């Protein structure tokens, strides 16, 4: 395994944690909004053998400082890449991390050599239908300070998804996700930083998908919420030349549920678009 180095970049209101390993062209990994950069552990060895890989904990997650309020997540990424002297990279993000990568690629097209999004919806995407019942219960549990229940509901919502019961999901995936989820739940990151946009991309990504020039791969899990799958279809249809891949046995985190297929899919795409 490639030797990793880790560190922090200093920001005006705290520190942001990152890890770097490998040599070659640069690949940046952005995590989902209920876990942290450890979600990429199943990819780390395979990816760092071929690329210089950067992963980071967003503020309020993992080893980074808490997020005191709404953030411009694109700026956090821009500060990280500037600190690491990255001028151009392939951008891979999951869920909220994918939305951030998409916005960043639209704001800084010269910096995106490739764009890979998984389980994401573009900024400005309008959800249809009733929200998952877990959301309302999660907000209520948060008001009551019941962090254990908040975490349980987030794991049900995103790891199990709407089509499975907990006992139908790999228990190790559930355990690792719950471990990562503990920190943002304790920091109330979702409620402090994620529920309202701060300096959102204007116009939002949904209105600009046809302007994306980077080679793009859109991925989703077939067992995820139907709106996430619909968002993937919208992006795949609108982004010029976009490729798609659906993971048949996964919900929101295909990279953890089907790591071998995920790694092969990503590495094949990156090799193709070099």
Language-model region placement:
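Acidic beta-to-alpha connecting loop that harbors the catalytic carboxylate
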Residues: 23-24, 222-224, 249-251
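Flexible "cap/lid" loop of the alpha/beta hydrolase fold
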Residues: 103-107, 112-144
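Conserved serine/cysteine hydrolase catalytic core
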Residues: 179-237, 246
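Conserved acidic catalytic loop of the alpha/beta-hydrolase fold
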Residues: 74-89
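Gly/Ala-rich beta-loop-alpha elbow adjacent to hydrolase catalytic centers
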Residues: 93, 97, 101
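Short beta-strand immediately N-terminal to the catalytic nucleophile in serine-hydrolase-like folds
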Residues: 91-93, 118
């Amino acid at each position: 395994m490639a030797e990793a180095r880790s560190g922090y970049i200093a920001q005006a209101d705290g520190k942001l944690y990152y890890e770097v390993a490998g040599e070659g062209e640069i690949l940046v990994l952005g995590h989902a909004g209920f876990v942290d950069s450890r979600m990429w552990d199943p990819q780390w060895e395979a990816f760092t053998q071929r690329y210089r890989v950067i992963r980071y904990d967003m503020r309020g997650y993992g080893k980074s400082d808490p997020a005191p309020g709404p953030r411009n997540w694109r700026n956090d990424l821009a500060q990280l890449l500037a600190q690491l002297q990255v001028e151009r990279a392939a951008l891979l993000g999951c869920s909220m991390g994918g939305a951030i990568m998409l916005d960043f690629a639209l704001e800084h097209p010269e910096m995106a050599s490739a764009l890979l999004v998984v389980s994401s919806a573009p900024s400005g995407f309008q959800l249809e239908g009733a929200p998952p019942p877990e959301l309302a219960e999660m907000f209520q549990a948060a008001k009551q300070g019941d962090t254990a229940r908040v975490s349980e509901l987030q794991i049900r919502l995103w790891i199990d998804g709407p089509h499975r019961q907990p006992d139908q999901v790999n228990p190790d995936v559930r355990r690792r996700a719950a471990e990562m989820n503990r920190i943002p739940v304790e920091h109330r990151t979702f409620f402090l930083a994620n529920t309202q946009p701060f300096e959102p991309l204007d116009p939002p990504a949904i209105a600009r998908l046809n302007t994306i020039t980077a080679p793009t791969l859109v991925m989703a899990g077939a067992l995820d919420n139907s709106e996430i799958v619909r968002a993937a279809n919208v992006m795949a249809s609108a982004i010029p030349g976009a490729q798609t891949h659906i993971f048949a046995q996964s919900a929101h985190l295909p990279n953890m549920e089907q790591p071998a297929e995920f790694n092969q899919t990503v590495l094949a795409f990156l090799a193709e678009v070099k």
